[in-house]
Amino acid sequence: MLAPVCAVLAAGLLGVAEAAPAPCVNQEIVLEAKPLEMDYRNNNAVLRDVVITQCGVRIQADEARITGGLDFENSHWTISGDVRITAEGGSLSSDKAIVAFRNKLISAATITGAPAQFEQQREDGTTARGHANTIEYQTTSGTVSFNNNAWLSYGRNEITGQQLVYNIRSQSVQGMTKPGAARGDGRVRIVIQPDKPPQITTPGQEKEKKP
């Protein structure tokens, strides 16, 4: 299990009030795609121009290779080519991802790329952006885990580390590390840029600006 190495940052830095979404129970999955190969004996398939939607989650990619069947009961889809996943105001993009389905629900997505990218428009008007070698998105918890060379920014501030976990509902971030990691491997670096001081002009300067 992952162990936290620093507490969730103060609400004034990153957090806002968390709004829990309605539970995704018995919600239909809508699949749009062009079938290329259908192997009914081995329960595998290859699809093109794939779009999957459920409970506000939208997944699209150029291609999907499916193991475990099209019933979404317990299957894994390897999607590739212009991968884009949108959910709860956030978006993930990469060249490749593995999407897991459990009990006819979109359960999780593991996104890999060079690097995998994340973006969310925050409630305070700033945009959170992040990237890492691997990003894991969990639909039930609303968490986005950045693994290996993780970087996250919001406004003019940024956080870096080997592992970061961002909650897209509470819009808060937590640094994480693995048990047994070498000392210093779990450190996070937070850079907070100061606000720019207001520009002060004298009455004489104002007059000079007038024609």
Which sequence ranges carry the predicted segments?
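Mature-chain termini and adjacent capping regions
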Residues: 1-211
